[in-house]
């Protein structure tokens, strides 16, 4: 579980309470700022200071520091490490460094050609100021259930490279996310890169989400990917987010559609099966059944677009 997880949850629920009491902090507690020159140096610092936190884009960390919801002894700034800022294609895989910003994903022609789902999703993340600061590694490490990129990695079948003092390991996206703001990342480890398979031209992808306003947290979202062959859908993956405690696949609905045409009748039947695998967690103003309805609306939209 991430050391930041309780703090992130607290950010969502405590700001109004603190403001109403008049005790909102706007400056962080004292900490030591460290800017390592290599990944190895960063890992050494994290190993020496168990309560240290990593600063990548800072989109989520800085508000938590300012509100004193986290008070680390050290903040390790990895933003200047070129080894974590790459876009490359090799052996059928697109590799994305953890420090790539959301705006980089949205603007990259390489990403557009190799993984259009990621580019489409990046354009939905927050507002331009957020996309200019937030990083792909930070989003995945934070594992916000309402985040766009974790669902995309799940839909594509991506994998995540993690590095610690003991070496590197690669974790499939399907097992990386374990709960609300929780991943398999261990203290002292850094998320180094993401890899996604470069898919054939017959694959089609759709990204969509529902929010009260553009840039708000999603009430429900969907990253969909499938292969259209002679009018029939194959290998369909429907990854929903902002529904449960982590992104999840609607396996039963996808299995029903395997080998079938995306006719209106088939799509409608598949929508009724989403609840077999997706079990939404309600929030104020958007209960479980409302979220499930949103998921159905998104699925119908996405599948209709894939069929067009």
What are these model-derived regions, one by one?
Residues 9-308:
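C-terminal structural segment of proteins
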Residues 2-8:
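Local cysteine-cluster metal-coordination motifs and their immediate loop/turn environment
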